[in-house]
């Protein structure tokens, strides 16, 4: 009897998480994605030399600790190429970066997020004021908050890993077949070097 109630509780939680995620994507597509952005995404876009010509990168850092440390290596390699790198990072991860004073940060606090895991209006307005040549979202699993944040920043090129609804947020998507994020980020860096 107890097992059945635990199973139904897990099923209910999974149902509500799925519902919350779908509702979040619906609201994000109607609130944060401008219709002009959607029209522009269908227009042909040249990626020739965009990484070589780019001066500033915003790297949206992942949440898991292992992915975070691998993402720092990725950011370091971009910086070694002479690019100005800013990190979009959650408040609880800032302590890991105190020794990396050569990065600029956009710090995300818990109060910057709604219950549907979307940026609050004030934070979204602040993000719209930011401008970068390239935005790279290093979240491999689905993360609606980071996908929306990557889209709010003023940038011509938005790069992310392929996941559900990613075509709404990124104009360059990388297919990820790796289990280890270090390999995924290395493959992404190799792909970017072609540009």
Where in the sequence are the language-model features?
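Active-site-proximal region of nucleotide-activated glycan assembly enzymes
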Residues: 2-24, 165-195
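Flexible, charged surface loops at secondary-structure boundaries
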Residues: 50-54, 79, 127-131
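Histidine-anchored nucleotide/phosphate-binding helix
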Residues: 57-60, 64-83, 87-88
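Cofactor-binding loop segments of dinucleotide-utilizing enzymes, especially the Rossmann-like FAD-
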Residues: 62, 90-92, 163
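Active-site and donor-binding regions of nucleotide-sugar-utilizing enzymes
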Residues: 110-178
């Amino acid at each position: 009897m107890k097992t059945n109630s635990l199973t139904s509780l897990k099923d209910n939680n999974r149902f509500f998480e799925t519902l919350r995620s779908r509702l979040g994507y619906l609201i994000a597509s109607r609130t944060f994605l401008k219709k002009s952005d959607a029209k522009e995404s269908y227009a042909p876009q040249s990626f020739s030399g965009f990484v070589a010509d780019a001066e500033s990168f915003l790297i949206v850092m992942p949440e898991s600790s292992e992915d975070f440390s691998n993402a720092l290596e990725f950011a370091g390699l971009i910086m070694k190429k002479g690019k100005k790198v800013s990190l979009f990072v959650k408040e609880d991860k800032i302590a890991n970066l105190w020794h990396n004073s050569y990065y600029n940060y956009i710090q995300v606090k818990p109060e910057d997020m709604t219950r549907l895991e979307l940026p609050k209006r004030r934070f979204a307005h602040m993000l719209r004021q930011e401008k970068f040549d390239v935005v790279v979202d290093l979240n491999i699993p689905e993360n609606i908050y980071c996908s929306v944040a990557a889209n709010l920043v003023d940038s011509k090129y938005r790069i992310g890993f392929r996941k559900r609804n990613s075509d709404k947020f990124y104009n360059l998507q990388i297919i990820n077949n790796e289990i280890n994020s270090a390999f995924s980020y290395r493959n992404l860096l190799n792909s970017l070097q072609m540009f």
